[in-house]
Structures are given as C-alpha cells and as structure tokens.
From Swiss-Prot:
GO MF annotations in UniProt: sulfur carrier activity; sulfurtransferase activity
Organism whose genome encodes this protein: Thermoplasma volcanium (strain ATCC 51530 / DSM 4299 / JCM 9571 / NBRC 15438 / GSS1)
NCBIfam families: fdhD_narQ (TIGR00129)
Name of the protein: Sulfur carrier protein FdhD
Function recorded in the entry: Required for formate dehydrogenase (FDH) activity. Acts as a sulfur carrier protein that transfers sulfur from IscS to the molybdenum cofactor prior to its insertion into FDH.
Predominant place of localization: cytoplasm
HAMAP family with a match to the protein in the record: FdhD
Source taxon at top rank: Archaea
Length: 279
C-alpha cells in the first residue's frame, strides 16, 4: 500500500483569532499547502512543451504529472515514459516544475495543444472543446467483477486511516485504488479532488498496475471530471462518500461504469451498473 508519508512542507502553521461563547481567543491552526505546478513534456530531443499549470498539494508530483498527461491524451501507454525530471526523492517537484520525457517512437501530440491552467477545484476548466473532453473516454470492457457490499462500506474507513494530511488540516481530498476484494493499492491526497485521482492513476501507470478490475474511492462528490479520469484509465467502479452529478450518472451508464455514492456507515446508493454488486 502506497501513500504520502512525508509531511514536511505540506502544511503551514497560522496564527488566528477564534471566537466562541467566551469571546475572542488567539489560536494556531495547520493549513494545507497549495502551490502551482507546471507540467511539461518533451518528445525525444525536441524542445519541452508546457501541458499546463495546476494548483496542487506538493507531494507525489511525479504521479500527478503522469496521471495528468494521461488524462489529457498526451500519454497513452506507460511504455511511452522515458524518464521524469525535476522530482525529489520525497516526490516534490524542484522549482515547481516537472518534465516527463516521452519515447519519440511512441509520442505524439496535438500541434495546437495549448497550455492550460487548472485550479484546485476544477479538473476540466480551460479545455478547448467539449468534443475534446469526451474524445478519450471509451466503454469499459465487459468483466465478471463481483464486489461484496461489506467491501464497499469498508473502503472509506480504510482510506480515511491513510489520510495523514486530512487528519492534520481537515482541508484535503483523497483518492484510493482498491482491488475488488478490498485490498488497498495506493492512496493519494491533494487539495484538489481531481489531482488526487490523477495521482493514483499516475502511480498505476508508473508501476504497471492493471486498473481494469479495480475500484476508485474518492473523498468528495462524484462529478463529471472524476468519472472522466476513471473512464480514461479503464477503472470500472467508482465509489464516493458524497453525491453524484446528473452528467456523472449519464456517462457511467453509457460507458459501463458502476457508480456508487453516499457510502456511509453500512449503506450506499448504486446509480449505475449494479450487476457488479453481490446481492
């Protein structure tokens, strides 16, 4: 099970004024660090190009860069990765820039590709066309996955136990990949929910993990951008502790993803493709 373990530089202490029934108090709080990251890519010996600037929590930037490039359609296969530059052992990009080198025999990109700015609350802001958003999402292959309901209700509990930054700040999202029998594979935290998903997808690509039988658990709502990233990565099941959006439901129904939301306590709602749940 992989998860963030280095907390240095990921939070900062702030002095504040707190008011309660007794009046004003001086207090301290830990807040989540948010910094920009420029994600670049280079094909062979060509000049590097900027894929975008994301606002993120500065940890596992290599995972984030690979996952982002994959969801943007610049990377299509882990074998295209020919090295990642600018990331320390702790997973933080030096100077907030990370460059992914792409094998020139396999790399290709849209010559009209423009640099994009992605803030920590929006995973699709700045994309140039609506058609481009849907282009890379394909139908999930038919499978025989069967998931016990007991596994589903256990996932948020397991993930929360791995959320070190959330326990310190209360202001961090998380995403995790689990096997169909509930074994944790990777957890990532980020101030942006879509960044957290990019991180676990990037990890799976770097490590060569087959995602076609896995479950994606997320800490926030299940909106379109989460479904988009799961569909591109070929993940068949999405679980959320919160609500879905109408478009997320429609896309999951169309593409064959199982969408499970409001996973709380011993209950949950299955919005699409309930055939993967044991009854």
């Amino acid at each position: 099970m992989k998860a963030a373990t280095h907390l240095n530089g990921l939070t900062s202490h702030r002095t504040l004024k707190r008011i309660d029934s007794y009046g004003w108090l001086e207090a301290e709080d830990q807040v989540a660090q948010e910094e920009p990251l420029e994600i670049k890519f280079r094909i062979g010996s060509d000049k590097e190009k900027s894929a975008g600037i994301v606002m993120r929590t500065p940890v596992h930037d290599d995972w984030l860069a690979v996952g982002f490039l994959y969801s943007e359609g610049i990377l299509h296969d882990r074998r295209w990765i020919n090295g990642i530059e600018g990331v320390s052992i702790e997973g933080k990009a030096q100077d907030n820039i990370v460059t992914v080198n792409i094998d020139p025999r396999n790399g290709s990109f849209d010559p009209d590709y423009r640099e994009r700015f992605v803030n920590s609350s929006c995973g699709i802001c700045g994309k140039s066309t609506i058609n481009g958003i849907f282009l890379r999402m394909g139908k999930i292959k038919r499978d025989n996955i069967k998931i016990d309901p007991g596994v589903i209700v256990s996932l948020p509990v397991i993930m929360k136990g791995m959320q070190q930054l959330f326990s310190k700040t209360g202001g961090i999202h998380a995403a995790a990949l689990f096997s169909a029998d509930g074994k944790p594979i990777v957890t990532a935290e980020d101030i942006g929910r879509h960044n957290a998903v990019d991180k676990v997808v990037g990890f799976s690509l770097i490590e060569g993990i087959d995602t076609s039988t896995l479950i994606l658990q997320v800490s926030g709502r299940a909106g379109f951008e989460i479904v988009e990233k799961a569909a591109i990565a070929g993940i068949p099941v999405i679980c959320s502790v919160s609500a879905p959006s109408s478009l997320a439901i429609e896309v999951c129904e169309s593409l064959g993803l199982t969408l499970i939301c409001f996973v709380r306590g011993s209950s949950f709602n299955v919005y699409t493709h309930a055939e993967r749940i044991m009854i």
